[in-house]
C-alpha cells in the first residue's frame, strides 16, 4: 500500500489492519480480502467480503475475483454482469481489450465514458486544473479514481499515487488496462468511515462529488487527507444547471459551505 500502508484501518471498528496472509488483512477478529493487491474494505458488503475470503482461504483465487467483479455502486444503471461473463473476463484478461473487458462486465454507458475519457473535455479540464496547481507533490490520493486514468498521469509525473473507489471492478480495470502496477488501490465506501488516515500532498476528486450521500463528511475527510497540501475537485456539477447525470448534485452556495476558502473556476 505504499505510503498508506501503516494507516489502513477497519471501516467498521477503526482497528489497524495488517496482513495476516498474502490475500487478507486482519484487525482484531475481523478479516478483509485482498485480490491482486487491492484491499476490499466496503463496510456495507461484509457478507461479500466473507464469501471472497472463504474462497481465497481455500486457495480458489478465481472464484473470489469473480464474486467481487459483480459488485456495483447504488447508482449503477445496468444490471450486474452474469457469472459466466465475469468468469470469461478473468480467464481472458491477458489478451482482450479494455473495451472488451468493460463490455463483459456490463459497464454500459460507463464503459463508453471510460473508453473515450482521454479526449473527454471534462477529463482535460481536470488535467488543466491539476497542472495549474501542481507543486510536484510526492504523494497523491485520488478519491473515486474509477479506472485509473488520472492515476496514470500522476504516476507518470513521478508521484506516489493512491486511488480509492467504491467499485472493485473499476480498480481491477485500472490495474490491468489503464494505470498499471504503480498506483496503490483501495476499494472502500467514502460515505462510511475511511480505512486510512495518512496524509497526501494532493487530494484529488474528479466528476464524483455529486455521487456521495454525506458530502460534508467526504469534504472533511478530503481536507484531512490533504493535510497541509491541496484539495482539487473538478467537474463537481451544479444542481442549478441542467444536466443528465446520475447522483445528487448541489449548488454553488452549498459547495462554498463545504469548502469556504475554495477558489472556483468555470468548468469550460
Predicted feature locations:
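Conserved class I S-adenosyl-L-methionine
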Residues: 137-146
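A short acidic, Gly/Pro-enriched loop at the edge of an enzyme's catalytic core
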Residues: 194-203
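Class I SAM-dependent methyltransferase SAM/SAH-binding core
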Residues: 147-192
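Conserved beta-strand signature within the Rossmann-like core of class I S-adenosyl-L-methionine
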Residues: 228-236
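Conserved alpha-helix/loop element of class I SAM-dependent methyltransferases that forms part
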Residues: 116-136
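A short glycine-rich, Lys/Arg-flanked "PGG" loop and its adjoining helix->strand segment in the class I
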Residues: 216-229
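Acceptor-substrate binding/catalytic loop of class I
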Residues: 239-254
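A short SAM/SAH-binding and catalytic strip from SAM-dependent methyltransferases
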Residues: 202-214
Amino acid at each position: 500500500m505504499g505510503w498508506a500502508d501503516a494507516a489502513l484501518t477497519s471501516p467498521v471498528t477503526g482497528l489497524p489492519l495488517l496482513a495476516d496472509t498474502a490475500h487478507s488483512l486482519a484487525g482484531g477478529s475481523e478479516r478483509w480480502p485482498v485480490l491482486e493487491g487491492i484491499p476490499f474494505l466496503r463496510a456495507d458488503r461484509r457478507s461479500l467480503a466473507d464469501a471472497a475470503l472463504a474462497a481465497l482461504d481455500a486457495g480458489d483465487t478465481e472464484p473470489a475475483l469473480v464474486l467481487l467483479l459483480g459488485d456495483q455502486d447504488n447508482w449503477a444503471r445496468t444490471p450486474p454482469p452474469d457469472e459466466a461473463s465475469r468468469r470469461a473476463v478473468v480467464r481472458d484478461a491477458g489478451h482482450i481489450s479494455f473495451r472488451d473487458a468493460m463490455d463483459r462486465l456490463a459497464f454500459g454507458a460507463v464503459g463508453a465514458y471510460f473508453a473515450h475519457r482521454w479526449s473527454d473535455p471534462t477529463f482535460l479540464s481536470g488535467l488543466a486544473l491539476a497542472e495549474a496547481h501542481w507543486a510536484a507533490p510526492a504523494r497523491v490520493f485520488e478519491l473515486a479514481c474509477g479506472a485509473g486514468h488520472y492515476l496514470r498521469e500522476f504516476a507518470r509525473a513521478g508521484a506516489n499515487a493512491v486511488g480509492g473507489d467504491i467499485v472493485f471492478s473499476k480498480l481491477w480495470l485500472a490495474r490491468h488496462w489503464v494505470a498499471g502496477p504503480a498506483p496503490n488501490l483501495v476499494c472502500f465506501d467514502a460515505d462510511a468511515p475511511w480505512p486510512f488516515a495518512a496524509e497526501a500532498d494532493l487530494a484529488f476528486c474528479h466528476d464524483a462529488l455529486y455521487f456521495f450521500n454525506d458530502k460534508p463528511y467526504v469534504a472533511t475527510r478530503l481536507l484531512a487527507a490533504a493535510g497541509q497540501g491541496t484539495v482539487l475537485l473538478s467537474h463537481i456539477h451544479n444542481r442549478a444547471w441542467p444536466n443528465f447525470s446520475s447522483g445528487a448534485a448541489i449548488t454553488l452556495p452549498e459547495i462554498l459551505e463545504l469548502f469556504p476558502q475554495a477558489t472556483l473556476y468555470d468548468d469550460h
